[in-house]
Amino acid sequence: MPTQRKIETVQELTEKLSRAQLVVVADYRGEGRGMSVADMTELRRKLREHGGEVVVAKNTLLKIAANHTGRGALDPLLAGPTAVTFAYDDVAKVAKALLDYLKSGNKSFTVRGALLGQALLPADALEQVTKLPSREQALAQVVGGIAAPVSGVVGVLNAAISNVLYVLQARIDQLQPQSSS
């Protein structure tokens, strides 16, 4: 019989998984004794600055939440001590913050893999995720792609109107009586 606390934890994880665009699964014990409280606090602070968060949870509860959200692809990554990083808005910034933390020399936090949307990614693909455009950049690219044909049409119409005006002005000049020199 599940306890009330486990039910609440599954609900929280389900909510986080459904909101997250990127989910990174890692082993937080890695080599030696694992992450210290200070290390975990520092990682949480860095991720929070970029709109992400890291949670340590039981694998069985994570599997239940993943299946509730249609993200059962996470199941193979959920073994052993597990920390899950959630990126809600700017996936690239959260991935970069996580990668910077990993490069800082902490061997006790090792990425097992990630889920970007519904695509399961290997651990080494995290660096590629950092190269994705931010939400604002992606929107600007879409708007630019939509606006480019419109501005081209405006330019063509302006040129056509100008040409008609030049022809009319030339005809007016022809019809005006020539002044004697």
Curated annotation (Swiss-Prot):
Molecular function as annotated in GO: large ribosomal subunit rRNA binding
Disulfide bond sites: none
Keyword Hydrolase belongs to the record: no
Top-level taxon of origin: Bacteria
GO cellular component: ribonucleoprotein complex; ribosome
Pfam families, alphabetized: Ribosomal_L10
UniProt KW keywords: Ribonucleoprotein, Ribosomal protein, RNA-binding, rRNA-binding
GO BP, sorted A to Z: translation
Family stated for the protein in its record: Belongs to the universal ribosomal protein uL10 family.
Function: Forms part of the ribosomal stalk, playing a central role in the interaction of the ribosome with GTP-bound translation factors.
Assembly description: Part of the ribosomal stalk of the 50S ribosomal subunit. The N-terminus interacts with L11 and the large rRNA to form the base of the stalk. The C-terminus forms an elongated spine to which L12 dimers bind in a sequential fashion forming a multimeric L10(L12)X complex.
Name of this protein: Large ribosomal subunit protein uL10
Species whose genome carries this gene: Chloroflexus aggregans (strain MD-66 / DSM 9485)
Lineage summary: Bacteria, Bacillati, Chloroflexota, Chloroflexia, Chloroflexales
Gene: rplJ
